[in-house]
């Protein structure tokens, strides 16, 4: 199945969790925080402005992004994988380099 987000929404695949601390302690899944980074796998057509124009999104498929800890509360399971659906304005930054 393939998701096509609407308007200014994006679909993000979370980065893999770091399950080991810098000191080598392995964290159980319940103790590890969910990562706030991911890769964009799909983007919507853009934000519809008040005058009816559609403004394209500033992010694109493949971008690595950082988002807030409470962003992306909409989780969708696609082909056994949990993906996040959020508005572009919930993305804090694009990771470059």
UniProtKB/Swiss-Prot annotation:
* GO BP, one annotated term: chaperone cofactor-dependent protein refolding
| Any Pfam family hit | Cpn10
Q: What is the top-level taxon of the source organism?
A: Bacteria
List, alphabetically, the SUPFAM superfamilies matched.
Answer: GroES-like (SSF50129)
Q: List GO molecular-function terms, semicolon-separated.
A: ATP binding; metal ion binding; protein folding chaperone; protein-folding chaperone binding; unfolded protein binding
Do you know which Gene3D superfamilies this protein is assigned to?
GroES chaperonin
Enumerate the InterPro entries for this protein.
Chaperonin_GroES (IPR020818), Chaperonin_GroES_sf (IPR037124), Chaprnonin_Cpn10_CS (IPR018369), GroES-like_sf (IPR011032)
Q: Tell me which HAMAP family the record gives.
A: CH10
User: Which family does the record assign?
Assistant: Belongs to the GroES chaperonin family.
The UniProt function text for this chain reads: Together with the chaperonin GroEL, plays an essential role in assisting protein folding. The GroEL-GroES system forms a nano-cage that allows encapsulation of the non-native substrate proteins and provides a physical environment optimized to promote and accelerate protein folding. GroES binds to the apical surface of the GroEL ring, thereby capping the opening of the GroEL channel.
Q: How does it assemble?
A: Heptamer of 7 subunits arranged in a ring. Interacts with the chaperonin GroEL.
Q: Specify the protein name.
A: Co-chaperonin GroES
Organism of derivation: Pseudomonas syringae pv. tomato (strain ATCC BAA-871 / DC3000)
